[in-house]
Swiss-Prot record:
Function according to Swiss-Prot or TrEMBL: Binds double-stranded DNA tightly but without sequence specificity. Involved in DNA compaction.
Gene name of this polypeptide: albA
Pfam short name (any one): Alba
Annotated protein name in UniProt: DNA/RNA-binding protein Alba
Organism superkingdom: Archaea
Annotated NCBIfam families: DNA-binding protein Alba, PRK04015.1
GO terms under biological process: chromosome condensation
Lineage, broadest ranks: Archaea, Methanobacteriati, Methanobacteriota, Stenosarchaea group, Methanomicrobia
UniProt source species: Methanothrix thermoacetophila (strain DSM 6194 / JCM 14653 / NBRC 101360 / PT)
Amino acid sequence: MAEDDVVFVGNKPVMNYVLAVVTQFNSGAKEVRIMARGRAISRAVDVAEVSRSRFLGDVVVKDIKISTETLNTDRGETNVSAIEIVLGK
């Protein structure tokens, strides 16, 4: 899987990320990874479900990985949850 086939979800509206996922599949990608951390995890799940159910009927959720990442902040180390959702045809 190429690094181009990854959509990092942040604070933008859900439909911006859905458009990115649909564009990746329409350009020939067989799999697209949706990645998010922290508060954006619920938005990433929304992106996967909207992409799969409304726009791409033949796409399925192939894998879901959850993890914890350690970030160094000015207040010391902080643990942040992360998710990776793999959609594929």
